[in-house]
């Protein structure tokens, strides 16, 4: 195969989906569904559990462990397949030249006949609304609340918005 290099600025492989998208969202969907079933459905099925309570710290730790296992798996595959991994940002200087500014302040020049640009996604803001990750959060922030918000308005009907609405509703938020 081709000699391959990957430049990733996030510091963890796997892109948006694995780090702040599909995977953490699905993890929280599963965990919140389990909580909801234990709290609302089990009793109707003859399974009685007293004192069910949510430990959001443990839930987030579980979600983060899922992400870590998968990112380490991607890193293992890179090593196994001899993919050079640069932690930093790449700047395209010509059709065959990339300068990589690594997170350790090292600068590396990479020449390549073939270049794939896969920039991932970034959070979009709305005009006049500042995302501060406190009371106005991005989808990334909604994946990492340290407590269940009493009320939550979700703007956007993409899959992450829908899933975050489901997660936080199951855990006790009033979601609009």
Residues covered by each model-derived region:
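Glycine-rich flavin
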Residues: 2-3, 8-148, 176
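Rossmann-like NAD(P)H-binding beta-loop-alpha module
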Residues: 146-176
């Amino acid at each position: 195969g081709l000699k391959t290099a990957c430049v990733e600025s996030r510091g963890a492989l796997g892109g948006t989906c694995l780090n702040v998208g599909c995977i953490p969202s699905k993890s929280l969907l599963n965990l919140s569904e389990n909580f909801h079933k234990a709290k609302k459905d089990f009793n109707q099925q003859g399974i009685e559990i007293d004192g069910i309570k949510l430990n959001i710290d443990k839930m987030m730790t579980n979600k983060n462990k899922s992400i870590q296992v998968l990112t380490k798996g991607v890193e293992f595959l890179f090593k196994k397949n001899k993919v050079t991994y640069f932690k930093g940002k790449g700047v395209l200087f010509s059709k065959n030249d990339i300068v990589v500014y690594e997170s350790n302040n090292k600068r590396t020049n990479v020449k390549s006949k073939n270049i794939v640009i896969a920039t991932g996604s970034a959070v979009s803001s709305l005009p006049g609304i500042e995302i501060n990750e406190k009371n106005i959060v991005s989808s990334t922030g909604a994946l990492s609340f340290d407590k269940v918000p009493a009320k939550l308005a979700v703007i956007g009907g993409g899959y992450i918005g829908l899933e975050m609405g489901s997660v936080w509703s199951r855990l006790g938020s009033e979601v609009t």
